[in-house]
């Protein structure tokens, strides 16, 4: 099952982003091929034997920035990974805002930094990255947040 996900995602990355021979990583609990549950171990063997540009296992700490073009995983694990990243980004952003609002010096520093931080931070918001393509269906389908605007949905 995950091998087909990898094939679809690599084909999509090539077509959508113009990546020649996209590199594919398998999300696991360690870089070693011996780590992971039975599905991950079996998928690792199959991807390693395939003609795909298989990088090997990648860990959760490697999701951003990723050392590969495509990271493949099952839906449950992928959802947990994405929600964890979302929570971590929210925590870091709110912590930075809290620190900036500590005193006059930090507020002044914040005013100097905000023009540079805000454009980067908005790249991670649902309004900018509102969803993802759902591959493997007989048609086009995007999974997204329910409160998005039409321009955001179009950008998916």
Please report, for each region that a protein language model flagged, where it lies by residue:
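Glycine-rich phosphate/diphosphate-binding loop of Rossmann-like nucleotide-binding domains
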Residues: 2-57
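Alpha-helical scaffold segments in soluble metabolic enzymes
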Residues: 4-15, 42, 46, 83, ...
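Flexible, glycine/charged-enriched surface loops at secondary-structure junctions
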Residues: 16-24, 51-61, 102-111, 126-132
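Short, catalytically relevant binding-site loops at active-site mouths
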Residues: 32-33, 60-64, 77-79
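Glycine-rich phosphate/nucleotide-binding loop
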Residues: 67-71, 76-148
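Single conserved hydrophobic/aromatic residue that forms the stacking wall/gate
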Residues: 147-155
